[in-house]
Amino acid sequence: MSDERYAASDGGGTEVGSGTRGRTTVVTKPATRPQRPTGKRSRQRAANASNTGANVEVEESSTQAAIAKEGKVKKPKKSADRSANPIVFIYNYLKQVVGEMRKVIWPNRKQMLTYTSVVLAFLAFMVALVGLADFGLAKLVLLVFG
């Protein structure tokens, strides 16, 4: 959803000038990072990601060239400490789950009411459809087999 729709209600998003003949002008505030994710990618973050991607490729190619010069490929050793303690594994897993749940964009009250009413209306329609089909087939069976 677009944030411009809600900007007029909070008083900071759109302003109508006296000589604009009813056209609106969108006034944006300086880019600040929101407290919670909004679901939109910021331009600054996208630009940083493209710059770091180029740096990583350069580093990888230089590392591969150094390994090719040596002629030996060393395999990294797996640490035995990672799988040793299942309690630490569960703790880390739950910590990651909480971190991912914080990234989720939760619906507001209006969206929840809309989604709930749509689901309940669909449920009522399907119950009526199945009920009528059952009733009709029961009557048909009674007519055929008497």
From Swiss-Prot:
Subcellular location: Cell membrane
Gly residues bias (residue ranges): 10-20
Chain positions covered by the region annotation Disordered: 1-81
A GO cellular component annotation in the UniProt record: plasma membrane
PROSITE patterns in the record: SECE_SEC61G
Entries under InterPro entries matching the protein: SecE_bac, SecE_sf, Translocase_SecE/Sec61-g
S-S bridge residues: none
Comp. bias regions, Basic and acidic residues: 69-81
A Pfam family it matches: SecE
Membrane-spanning segments: 118-138
Family note: Belongs to the SecE/SEC61-gamma family.
Quaternary data: Component of the Sec protein translocase complex. Heterotrimer consisting of SecY, SecE and SecG subunits. The heterotrimers can form oligomers, although 1 heterotrimer is thought to be able to translocate proteins. Interacts with the ribosome. Interacts with SecDF, and other proteins may be involved. Interacts with SecA.
HAMAP family according to UniProt: SecE
Described function: Essential subunit of the Sec protein translocation channel SecYEG. Clamps together the 2 halves of SecY. May contact the channel plug during translocation.
Name of the protein this chain belongs to: Protein translocase subunit SecE
Species, as recorded: Mycobacterium leprae (strain TN)
Encoding gene (name): secE
